[in-house]
Amino acid sequence: MNFIEHIDNIVKSYGISNYNIQKFRSVYKINSKDRILLIKKFNSKTKLFNTKKIINHLKYNNFKYIQNIYYNLKNEFYFEFKNKFYACFSWVDGREVNIKNVKEIKKCTKTIYLFHESIKNVNDFSMILKDNSDWIEKFEEDIFNLYDIKNKLTKVNSLSELDKFYYENIDKAILKISEIINILNENNFNKFLSENKIICHSSLYYQNFILGKNDKIYLIDFGGISLNNRVYDLARFARRVFYKNSFDTKVLNDIYKVYNKYYKFSEFEKTLFDSYLRNPYKFVKLGYRFYIQNKNIDELKLLNKLKKYCKYELNL
């Protein structure tokens, strides 16, 4: 059986015989006379089951703007094909949000708050969740990788323009990350974490916010949920919006103020938000991909990217 035949079998198991199929990113839109479905692929059963459970918890806690997961005529909700897993969801009639639109950014921020509030008291031990809440460990790993890259570059006989630029800025990046670690340690971050750990979405990209025809923001794709704290989710979203808006600090203030309107941040949480955004994330990530993972990346394009991000990341 090929993939198309497999999809056809899935659709027919829902009592649908005549339909059109379109691919959008990593999902398939099934359009029939009676209804529209979405078929999504999952690389692991864990992500699939976590998604189902988190949707159930959100609905129970009155978080309305999410997709439904559908069972077929045999009361099955997922299907396996070549070690991949597929499930059917309701189709949200709308479009991806525009993260250069201030009004839509604010709507997304409120949706993030509502998601956190709906999920903050969930303790479902049947869910297998990645715990990536140890910021200090992650930042220390970044420093280790930067030293590794620095050591490699010191052994290169003839440095390229890219090599020189990266080498000249490594110490500055290490210093910034070290300062963040010091702030976390001085404020007893581990104690804070033990008291404030919740389930986070962890994938708050603009394509996971759908602006419905009813002008409501729908949150989708819960396959990447993890354990962290609410500042983590918000700061990661803010960073993505910030980078897409040419490093306009006003959008950071807008995001913080909207969330803070509903949930009053403590002084330390404000410090966490600011610290996360001071992390030279792109400098570390791009360097790691090129120098440690040995990804085949055009050096000139990479150099231009690094220069663009470093204007902000290494000069705060």
Predicted segments, located by residue:
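Short, solvent-exposed loop/turn elements at beta->coil junctions and helix N-caps
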Residues: 25-27, 72-77, 189-190
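Active-site acidic catalytic loop and adjacent metal/ATP-binding pocket
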Residues: 29-31, 69, 181-230
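ATP-binding pocket architecture of kinase catalytic cores
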Residues: 35-127
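ATP/Mg2+ or Mg2+-diphosphate-binding catalytic cores
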Residues: 147, 283-316
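ATP-dependent phospho-/nucleotidyl transfer catalytic cores
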Residues: 20-21, 42-45, 97, 126-199, ...
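Active-site activation/catalytic loop segments of kinase-like enzymes and analogous catalytic loops
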Residues: 231-264, 277-296
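ATP-binding glycine-rich phosphate-binding loop
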Residues: 9-32
